[in-house]
């Protein structure tokens, strides 16, 4: 159903329109996307006729800044924080609404000789400002379009249009697939674009490495920063870096302040952390990644709010969903980049979570074996562990 990102890029370079679909838990919509330089009157008319939604022009912050395109509102209350600027028309257009005139305005946005005074405000073209970091910062159609443009070697501007059904309802994947098939368009997902970017873009910087004696042995600790969100991650290493031969014992551990530091009995995170360090030390060779993904990615305060809901009878999955989050928001692309920086290509993964295996393999790493890391359940965390087993697919046995 969906095409590889590489095929979509080739289609865009040829001037074709593609379709980009986001996740079911977000807008669950598809947009037509074309590079701004190929936004001919025919392309604009195609989008207006078959998309029926609002035609917008995602732009990089650089282009928006050069043309003095400011946010439409000072306080954005849109649920997805879509960054509209004030709408525009080129000053040489008449009504500005025809396909020809909208195409003219879009093309002028790309002209490096264009100045802010060349555009009237308001108008019939709706620029959108993409966040720096693209889909790795915000998984929206705006960022996806600009990321695709940049990957094509373009300036970072596109034209997009939401796809609606003939009855005025929003088209979902089944209807969008039929549209793609009938018009022979490439169709991709933002999720696949995120994985593509993690695989082609280096987003971590090794900042420091030191020797750290611990209760489990002496480790070499490498400190990394993430260019997307500025978070700091650690790699506890035993053995010589880079790891150039044989599978390496690896644990990818997400931060849990309450469990790792304060020995909380609500989870098994602290015991897992210590057990993993002990096993790596016993093997004499391995890596423990400590990723700043508190509360399966929802953050410390939200995790505490989830705990409060659990006290009211929710399980760990239901609590996350009641707060408006997916059960697990973690992403392993940054972890995969750190492992690659350390020379890890093949590993034995300490985990009970099959999604973690799939997540790392999706970034080109090879996992030869899964090493279980099950801790003894307590009266305080037994229900939590059973929920992880039943609802999140963790490989646990009671």
From Swiss-Prot:
- Cofactors: Mg(2+); Mn(2+); Zn(2+)
Q: How is the cofactor bound?
A: Binds 2 divalent metal cations per subunit. Magnesium or manganese.
Keyword list (alphabetical) reads:
GTP-binding, Hydrolase, Lyase, Magnesium, Manganese, Metal-binding, Multifunctional enzyme, Nucleotide-binding, Riboflavin biosynthesis, Zinc
- The record's region (GTP cyclohydrolase II) falls at 200-398
Q: Which Pfam families match?
A: DHBP_synthase (PF00926), GTP_cyclohydro2 (PF00925)
Gene Ontology CC annotation, any one: cytosol
Region described as DHBP synthase: spans on this chain: 1-199
Q: What is the lineage of its organism?
A: Bacteria, Bacillati, Bacillota, Bacilli, Bacillales
The keyword Ion transport appears for this protein: no
- In Swiss-Prot or TrEMBL terms, this protein is called Riboflavin biosynthesis protein RibBA
- The Enzyme Commission number assigned here is 4.1.99.12, 3.5.4.25
Quote the gene name from the UniProt entry.
ribBA
Asked if Transferase is a keyword of the record, the answer is no
